[in-house]
């Protein structure tokens, strides 16, 4: 009996530790193939954010209690972040965008660190945090690039393009290249950190499946939060840079 319990426990731990990279479960939607496992975990993240938002704000009180405290703290945190990075005149309209980015990335990262997605079986590949897929992080980075282009162009019109030859015309190639490196750095930084964290935890659980991986998992929670903050902060900084006046 003891041997059976030990074997079943070991099998469960190894199932948790199993890591498969580059394998995807595809859904066919019309002519397009999409990563089904990313959509499933993304819907879970959206549901968590929606449930917490509704639960925390359905019965607002003058003196906040419970989840209302949490939602107000998050709102103030994102508002201060936007104000710091974008400036007092323009920051208000960008709070929803930065807040959505931060919450989606934060909950996605923490879902990968806290939920043993690997034990849920799908026909191919495995479930993981949405930000563990390069397609998700690239999409978030391109969305950020679109946002700061829109911010600059909507405020300055064609004058926005003067930034490419400022302070000197010979800097044009460097400034153009910078617009390509920004989304690259955003996407690969987030993807690399989340993937590396899940791989390290998976390997440690396979090698030493008791208490040794726990500090790494706790560090992963901290890193996951930092990555969400870094992404949202850089997004705000890029938007602020695109709308500031160059002299």
Swiss-Prot record:
It is found in: Plastid, Chloroplast thylakoid membrane. GO terms for molecular function: proton-transporting ATP synthase activity, rotational mechanism. SUPFAM superfamilies: F1F0 ATP synthase subunit A. It is a multi-pass membrane protein. The chain crosses the membrane at residues 36-56, 95-115, 134-154, 199-219, 220-240. One of its GO terms (cellular component) is proton-transporting ATP synthase complex. Key component of the proton channel; it plays a direct role in the translocation of protons across the membrane. HAMAP family: ATP_synth_a_bact (MF_01393). Belongs to the ATPase A chain family. F-type ATPases have 2 components, CF(1) - the catalytic core - and CF(0) - the membrane proton channel. CF(1) has five subunits: alpha(3), beta(3), gamma(1), delta(1), epsilon(1). CF(0) has four main subunits: a, b, b' and c. This is ATP synthase subunit a, chloroplastic. The lineage of its organism: Eukaryota, Viridiplantae, Chlorophyta, Ulvophyceae, OUU clade. The gene is atpI.
């Amino acid at each position: 009996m003891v041997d059976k319990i030990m074997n079943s426990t070991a099998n469960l731990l190894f199932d948790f530790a199993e890591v498969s990279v580059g394998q995807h479960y595809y859904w066919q939607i019309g002519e397009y193939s999409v990563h089904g496992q990313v959509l499933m975990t993304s819907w879970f993240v959206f549901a968590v954010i929606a449930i917490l938002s509704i639960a925390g704000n359905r019965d607002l009180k003058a003196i906040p209690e419970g989840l209302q405290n949490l939602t107000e703290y998050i709102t103030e945190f994102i508002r201060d972040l936007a104000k710091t990075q974008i400036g007092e005149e323009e920051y208000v309209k960008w709070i929803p965008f930065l807040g959505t980015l931060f919450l989606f990335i934060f909950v996605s990262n923490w879902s990968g660190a806290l939920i043993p997605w690997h034990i849920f079986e799908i026909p191919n590949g495995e479930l993981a945090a949405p930000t563990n897929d390069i397609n998700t992080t690239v999409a978030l980075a391109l969305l950020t690039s679109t946002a700061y282009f829109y911010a600059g162009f909507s405020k300055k019109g064609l004058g926005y393009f003067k930034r490419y030859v400022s302070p000197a015309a010979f800097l044009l190639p460097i400034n153009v290249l910078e617009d390509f490196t920004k989304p690259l750095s955003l996407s690969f930084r987030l993807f690399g950190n989340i993937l590396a964290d899940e791989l390290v935890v998976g390997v440690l659980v396979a090698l030493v499946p008791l208490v040794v991986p726990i500090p790494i998992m706790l560090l992963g929670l901290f890193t996951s939060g930092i990555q969400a903050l870094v992404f949202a902060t850089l997004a705000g900084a890029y938007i602020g840079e695109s709308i500031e006046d160059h002299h």
